[in-house]
């Protein structure tokens, strides 16, 4: 740091000495030679300069003092820090490597992908800036070979777009890849079909159906008989059932009762269908014999259908006219519900 000298009174002797020194300087050689000589002398003989300063101080205490520049302490500290920084770098790298080794592979993979994406974006921005500058200057642009990015076709949206409402539907792309397969020969598409409803199967005939699937009625009768026997055994075992199993046995009895009712309804339906078919066949046979004698076409009415059905039902029931379902009045209402336009066919 430069040393500031205090202002002191100047004597006549000192003024005279200063004038003599100025005259000597004017008579001395050029400034460049003086500087070169002084620099060389300063470098070679540092001790002589110190002695001269001491002589000046000793000759006249009132003469102006000359201050020597010295470097600041801050500059010294900065140089020391710059020398120490390259020494610290290897230790920091080793610490980072140790930290990265402790991380899981999944986290490292995610970080690698993020860095690659950021680097690609920065490269694209730099390339676009270079192209614009080259177009302005008219210089040639070097083309870099880049691989085409693979397009992934997925049903979900990879980019997170802000939605107006959290309950709003997600936007899904409508773009689909074109098939690489080329259709050379068009093959007819296979359509599932049911042979029962094809036109080649012909019209539905109840008589033929009854003859082909008549075994189903017999199997339902046997099933009903077995269910009734099982229900009777379950009710009998209920009396000697322990308390902790009573709920399960009651549920089992209820299930068997429902199965018996369902099977009974199927058996009764099969029996009614058989009676109806027999009554219609009998009426049809009688009308065909009358047509042979010269009678014209005849259409079955609802009242005649009920009469034929009741007559056939009476043949299969008891002579008293009572059935398990009720009397003849309730049976007539049942027959009226079974009337269908199919019964109006001509005979």
From Swiss-Prot:
- Keyword Ribonucleoprotein in record: yes
Which biological processes are named by the entry's GO terms? Answer: maturation of SSU-rRNA from tricistronic rRNA transcript (SSU-rRNA, 5.8S rRNA, LSU-rRNA)
Q: Superkingdom, according to UniProt?
A: Eukaryota
One GO cellular component, as annotated = nucleolus
Q: List the disulfide bonds.
A: none
Regions of biased composition (Acidic residues) lie at 47-61, 122-143
- Comp. bias intervals (Basic and acidic residues): 76-88, 144-157
Q: Name one Pfam family in it.
A: RRP36
The UniProt keyword set, sorted, is: Coiled coil, Nucleus, Ribonucleoprotein, Ribosome biogenesis, rRNA processing
In this chain, the stretch annotated as Disordered covers: 1-187, 318-347
Protein location: Nucleus, Nucleolus
What segments bear the compositional bias annotation Low complexity?
36-46
Keyword Cell division set for record? no
Q: Which residues form a coiled coil?
A: 216-273
Similarity comment: family membership: Belongs to the RRP36 family.
How it assembles, according to the record, is: Associates with 90S and pre-40S pre-ribosomal particles.
What function does this protein fulfil? Component of the 90S pre-ribosome involved in the maturation of rRNAs. Required for early cleavages of the pre-RNAs in the 40S ribosomal subunit maturation pathway.
Spell out the protein name for this chain.
rRNA biogenesis protein RRP36
Q: Which organism is it from?
A: Coprinopsis cinerea (strain Okayama-7 / 130 / ATCC MYA-4618 / FGSC 9003) (Inky cap fungus)
- Gene symbol of the encoding locus: RRP36
């Amino acid at each position: 740091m430069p040393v500031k000298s205090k202002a002191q009174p100047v004597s006549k002797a000192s003024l005279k000495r200063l004038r003599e020194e100025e005259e000597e300087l004017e008579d001395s050689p050029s400034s460049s030679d003086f500087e070169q000589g002084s620099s060389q002398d300063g470098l070679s003989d540092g001790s002589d300069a110190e002695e001269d300063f001491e002589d000046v101080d000793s000759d006249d205490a009132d003469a102006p003092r000359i201050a020597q520049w010295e470097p600041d302490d801050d500059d010294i500290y900065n140089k020391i820090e710059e020398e120490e920084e390259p020494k610290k770098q290897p230790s920091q790298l080793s610490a980072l490597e140790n930290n990265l080794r402790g991380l899981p592979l999944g986290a490292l993979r995610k970080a690698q992908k993020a860095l690659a994406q950021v680097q690609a974006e920065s490269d694209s921005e730099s390339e676009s800036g270079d192209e614009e500058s080259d177009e302005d200057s008219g210089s040639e642009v070097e083309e870099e070979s880049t691989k085409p990015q693979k397009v992934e076709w997925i049903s979900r949206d990879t980019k997170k777009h802000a939605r107006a409402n959290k309950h709003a539907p997600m936007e899904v792309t409508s773009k689909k890849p074109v098939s690489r397969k080329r259709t050379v020969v068009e093959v007819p598409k296979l359509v599932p079909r049911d042979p029962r409803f094809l036109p080649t199967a012909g019209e539905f005939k109840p008589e033929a159906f009854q003859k082909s699937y008549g075994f189903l009625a017999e199997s339902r009768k046997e099933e009903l008989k077995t269910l009734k026997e099982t229900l009777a055994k379950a009710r009998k075992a209920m009396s000697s059932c322990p308390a902790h199993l009573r709920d399960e046995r009651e549920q089992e009895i209820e299930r068997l009762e429902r199965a018996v009712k369902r099977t009974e309804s199927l058996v009764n339906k099969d029996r009614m269908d058989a009676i109806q078919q027999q009554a219609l066949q009998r009426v049809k046979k009688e009308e065909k014999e009358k047509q042979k004698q010269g009678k014209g076409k005849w259409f079955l009415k609802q009242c005649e259908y009920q009469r034929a059905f009741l007559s056939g039902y009476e043949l299969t029931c008891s002579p008293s006219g009572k059935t398990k379902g009720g009397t003849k009045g309730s049976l007539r209402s049942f027959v009226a519900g079974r009337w269908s336009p199919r019964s109006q066919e001509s005979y």
